[in-house]
């Protein structure tokens, strides 16, 4: 059963010039429970090589490994699953090609999108953007905690809050119904990636009453 407490998205260009695997190791050392590889510009061959290395690191750490958007890469590197946005491969097609055993995550910013994703076979939702964020240019207007609460009431599958989340507001995201938080710059943009991940994981763990 995947644990969504701290879901760290790896996008190399936001990592301050550090090697991708260094960012992954730091996030895992700090307690990341899931890692998503989100590289929109790398050639397929490089993505496969990188994905295989991350697969090994996440397996050793007992963390879930998700690939963003690229179904072919997710299958090639034997990732645990795929995450897609509203403009990516349609969820029913992704589910059919992935098969029943792999995890399918879908981004949702409205209750209608969330309900449809659940019907289409999503295993979890990435919900947001909760707060304003500079990490994703396609994040859209923030839905706030009220938007998150509405989506939580609309679906039964796990929800990971996305967008502008940091140690100061993460507890509120959990209180509003999220099962975990997804972050990019709050962890991989930090000077000490492991320490940043550890702090966020502690906040989420306390908020969830674990």
Swiss-Prot record:
Cofactor: Mg(2+)
Entry keyword set: Magnesium, Metal-binding, Thiamine biosynthesis, Transferase
Positions of Mg(2+) binding: 69, 88
Pathway note: Cofactor biosynthesis; thiamine diphosphate biosynthesis; thiamine phosphate from 4-amino-2-methyl-5-diphosphomethylpyrimidine and 4-methyl-5-(2-phosphoethyl)-thiazole: step 1/1
Keyword Aminoacyl-tRNA synthetase belongs to the record: no
Top-level lineage group: Bacteria
Enzyme class label: transferase
GO molecular function, one term: thiamine-phosphate diphosphorylase activity
InterPro entries referenced in this protein's UniProt entry, alphabetically: Aldolase_TIM, ThiamineP_synth_sf, ThiamineP_synth_TenI, TMP_synthase
UniProt: 2-[(2R,5Z)-2-carboxy-4-methylthiazol-5(2H)-ylidene]ethyl phosphate binding residues: 133-135, 164, 184-185
Binding residues for 4-amino-2-methyl-5-(diphosphooxymethyl)pyrimidine: 36-40, 68, 107, 136
HAMAP family per UniProt: TMP_synthase (MF_00097)
Classification via NCBIfam families: thiE (TIGR00693)
Annotated family: Belongs to the thiamine-phosphate synthase family.
Protein name per UniProt: Thiamine-phosphate synthase
